[in-house]
Amino acid sequence: MKKLILFALASLAIISCRKDDDESKPTIVGNWKISKSILKFGNGSSQTYTLDSCESQNNFTLQKDGKMSSVSYGIDFNGNCVSRTANGTFSYDEQNKRLVMYADEVTTVEVSSITKNELIVISIPSYDNDNDGKEDKLYIYFTK
């Protein structure tokens, strides 16, 4: 009887650990709101872009079923903050760290880092913004 109870407790502990491991793994699914953008130059320097109160509302939502929506904010010709919503689908290749969103247009980004509450992506393609012959990368930070 003691062996049976010990076996049951050990099995329960193993199952509990597996569940905890799955829950702690970061997921790309969720509502992501932009927090900042940093342009990292090929020469090692960087420039942080300050978002105005309108741009700081930009966000997108990725759902478990592969559907997505994004809301982009910008200033119109009259100085008003206006929004534009796009709906579509997405795919995420975890191994190659590629997120592709299919809405009004196709957007592909490289996932640099993902945690429970932060997503950092690199805009694709990269450009030589300062014309020094070195590739510069735009890092975009999002929070849940």
Predicted regions mapped to residue ranges:
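C-terminal motif of bacterial Sec signal peptides marking the signal peptidase cleavage site
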Residues: 14-16
